[in-house]
Amino acid sequence: MRAWEDFLLLQEKEIGTSTVDKWLRSLKVLCFDACNLYLEAKDSFQVTWFEEHIRHKVKTSLVNNNGKLIRVHITSLDKTAPFYKEKQIQQEKTAYFTMQYGNVNPEMTFGNFLVTPENDLPFRILQEFTKPAEDTAGFPFNPIYLFGPEGSGKTHLMQAAVNALREFGGKILYVASDLFTEHLVSAIRSGEMQRFRSFYRNVDALFIEDIEVFSGKGATQEEFFHTFNSLQTEGKLIVISSAYAPADLKAMEERLISRFEWGVAVPIHPLTKEGLRSFLMHQAEQLSVRIEDTALDFLIHALSSNVKTLIDALKLLSKRVAYKKLAQQLLYEDDIQTLLHDVLEVAESVRLTPSGIVRAVAKYYGVSPESILGRSQSREYVLPRQVSMYLCRQKLSLSYVRIGDVFSRDHSTVISSIRAISQKVEEGGDDISIATQELMKSLTSAYKSLEFFPEEEISC
């Protein structure tokens, strides 16, 4: 249809041909009448991108020959079947979407949270303010905003607070930020915004993780702003987590940042290496396992310093030591490799490495790992190469020199490449920023898959 093609040409001038080709021209036109255009996306992520970046534009720029605005209806292949009849399209327009709570692990409690000098303050704050209120004055610090790097214990503390509050009844909503966005997009598509707002605002407390996911997402930020105001006005508890302090959030509306700072913003830091070793040595003693210092260091490294995984490994080690009648024997690195060989093999298979990052980026962009590591200066390969370097820096904390060794580049090239991607990520909103965010999420999911122990073996 001519109106849609004219709109795409206009967008090429505004956001670039490559972005239009990837996100808009790949949309399939299912049906068109004088005032309605029905599109099909390849997946829900493409729908989300459309809602965040294009929806507001079609509302003002997509018109028919009579100058009337054309309404765009978009569905995705991974959630709906193809539509060939107008009746089926109408059914999709009015479909009732699913709202669900985020998953909360009942084993994550305040009682089994490892309290250290690095996390004592956020622990005490959340524990105090998740007790049942004795009056109706609400919470003296609202919202509670936790920020710190991956592995610092934010998720455990958040879920411990949710579990504590649910013991006293009430409606406690816990969601990740990407689930909030997914719910919003579904509500917009199906015309169920009133239901969406009721779901998020008729609660006694809202816990939302990884708020930085909202960066660059105007529609999501707008809706969360009103959700926040509604809950705040009614004195409902709001707890937010992020990798960044409020002032360090990029592509986030100032009015939201201001509200995040209304209550208390508390940093939370991961365990120091010495603190982790001391804690694990104490755990081993409690389990009647004697482990030599360098053997413990080996285990910490092998299991990527994941506290929960390390505790489970010690429990499993205790059972196997007892079974083999090795109690009170000092265990060395060779003993650990023998007794936990199956665990270590799985851990190695999911360990995040530079080559693993390159493979993930290659798969995302549809190129080969060899082309990313090669010498070609074609943009088709340069961009994935730069993203790979950026992720190696962010996820593995590799030095510029080490990254240069991996990609056979000098460190100045590495620095400029990483800076280029960092700038795009900070600005937010474009396809490079979105791709990097998706890759970070998928790599984090793979890392978290270290939790692989059979429950019947480690329960004590």
UniProtKB/Swiss-Prot annotation:
List the residue ranges of the region (Domain II).
Answer: 68-102
Q: Its Gene Ontology molecular function terms?
A: ATP binding; ATP hydrolysis activity; DNA replication origin binding; lipid binding
Tell me where in or outside the cell this protein is found: Cytoplasm
Tell me which Gene Ontology terms the entry assigns under biological process: DNA replication initiation; regulation of DNA replication
Tell me the segments the record calls region Domain IV, binds dsDNA: 322-460
Xref: Pfam families: Bac_DnaA, Bac_DnaA_C
An annotated GO cellular component: plasma membrane
Keywords (alphabetical) are: ATP-binding, Cytoplasm, DNA replication, DNA-binding, Lipid-binding, Nucleotide-binding
**Which residues are noted in the entry as ATP-binding?**
151, 153-155
Fill in the subunit field for this protein: Oligomerizes as a right-handed, spiral filament on DNA at oriC.
- Free-text domain note: Domain I is involved in oligomerization and binding regulators, domain II is flexibile and of varying length in different bacteria, domain III forms the AAA+ region, while domain IV binds dsDNA.
Similarity comment text for this entry: Belongs to the DnaA family.
Entry's PANTHER family?
CHROMOSOMAL REPLICATION INITIATOR PROTEIN DNAA
Protein name, as recorded = Chromosomal replication initiator protein DnaA 2
Q: Which organism is it from?
A: Chlamydia caviae (strain ATCC VR-813 / DSM 19441 / 03DC25 / GPIC)
Question: What gene does this protein come from?
Answer: dnaA2
